[in-house]
Amino acid sequence: MPSFDKPTDQQEATRDAQGADSRAATEVALFEAFGGVRGMVETTVPGLVFVAIYTVKRDIHIAAIAALGLSLLLGIARLVRKDTLKHAFSGVFGVAFGAVFAMMSGDAKNFYLPGMLYTLGLAVGYIVSALAGYPLMGLILGPVFKENLSWRTRNPGRKVAYTKASWAWGLILLAKSAVLFPLYWWGDVTQLGWVKVALGIPPMLLSVYLTWIFLSKAPPPIDVFAEMEAAERAEREREATAR
């Protein structure tokens, strides 16, 4: 006699398959949202070019123009590949601010200051938003998973996951800032540059990995767009039946 208290092997296999599909979809969506490995590399390479050229030439203008030129080429390449404008130009603007700031101030360390301030501000934003009950990671990824803000009011498990992810991002970026700002104040530009390059990809990968862990254990997202389409379809069917 079959037991109705325990799931059958087929049901367990179906759940495992659905869970694997959900984790895979989460992984793909996360890497898409943050530009993928290529995006991480592209945000690091201009800084590497700047510090390498400055170490050899000791010329702020040559180093800054080279870094900015490379960033523009990478952005154009993304446009040719029909990537999103966000991924194509987000790095370009950051490098441009740093290049202009360094050349105007005459201090090569200022090439890195806009990015450092952005990182610190982002860290504070993640932590404050988590404390306020509106985790920034949920606001960023909600549209990616087609759930918008449904995670906050209708899916408490997702809210918990987004809160944990926001804390993870905030603390990791805060730790990164705690390393970089003392080097900016008391170190030289080569020390700051090489350490900043070294701290480019690993913290990002760790943050994305922890986000994936939290979301893969959370309930699946509620597709609000599918719900709206279903409601519109049902409304059209009712109208057709009433005629």
List PLM regions with ranges:
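Short, Lys/Arg-rich, polar N-terminal cytosolic tail immediately upstream
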Residues: 1-35, 232-233
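Cytoplasmic-side transmembrane-helix entry/capping segments in multi-pass membrane proteins
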Residues: 85-96, 112-119
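Alpha-helical transmembrane segments of multipass membrane proteins
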Residues: 47-55, 72-76, 99-103, 124-127, ...
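Membrane-proximal helix-loop-helix units in multi-pass membrane proteins
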Residues: 109-160
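Membrane-interface helix caps and helix-loop-helix hairpins in membrane proteins
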Residues: 80-84, 104-112, 189-190
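Structural signature of hydrophobic alpha-helical transmembrane segments
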Residues: 53-69, 88
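Short juxtamembrane and helix-loop transition motifs at transmembrane-helix boundaries
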Residues: 17-32, 45-56, 72-82, 161
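C-terminal membrane-adjacent module
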Residues: 145-243
